[in-house]
């Protein structure tokens, strides 16, 4: 299947006016959402064009390959595999080597059941694990994929569906 989005907000004049103005923020949001979806679905081919300029042309690959395609070749040698399987959750993915930590926090991704989510407590836990390994003010890279029984996670906490709530049982 192929999906193409053109003339976004064509029928919504107030949104169209926003786009016709300074659209750099919107472009950044579209790119960010594209990256999240592409990182969750490495087996899918994706292409992103903005104003007819090719931004991404992603071929099907594995998770590591997709991370390299999105973030850049520099990250390839800095990814450490993570794999934990319990009766409650399966955790897979990659964390960055401590020496590759950066001041910017643009390489931190959490996914649950194929969906990107944001969790301040989980982010703090991951950063705390690096506490003595990285300079203060730096952030480690991480790409963590959780698989949980769908009955144990609620994705309807926030309209953007980026906040999730996990069941305690």
Language-model segments: residues:
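N-terminal phosphate-binding caps/lids of nucleotide- and nucleic-acid-binding domains
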Residues: 1-169
């Amino acid at each position: 299947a192929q999906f193409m989005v053109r003339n976004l907000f064509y029928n919504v004049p107030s949104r169209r006016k926003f786009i016709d103005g300074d659209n750099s923020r919107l472009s950044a949001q579209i790119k960010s959402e594209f990256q999240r979806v592409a990182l969750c679905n490495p087996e899918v081919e994706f292409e992103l064009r903005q104003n007819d300029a090719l931004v991404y042309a992603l071929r099907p690959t594995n998770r590591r390959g997709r991370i390299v395609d999105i973030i850049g070749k520099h990250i390839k040698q800095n990814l450490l595999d993570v794999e934990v399987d319990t009766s409650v959750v399966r955790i897979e993915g990659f964390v960055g080597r401590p020496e590759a930590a950066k001041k910017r926090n643009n390489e931190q991704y959490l996914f649950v059941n194929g969906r990107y989510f944001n969790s301040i407590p989980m982010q703090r836990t991951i950063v705390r694990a690096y506490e003595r390994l990285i300079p203060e003010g730096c952030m480690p890279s991480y790409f963590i994929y959780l698989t949980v029984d769908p009955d144990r996670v609620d994705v309807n906490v926030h309209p953007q569906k980026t906040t999730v709530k996990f069941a305690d049982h």
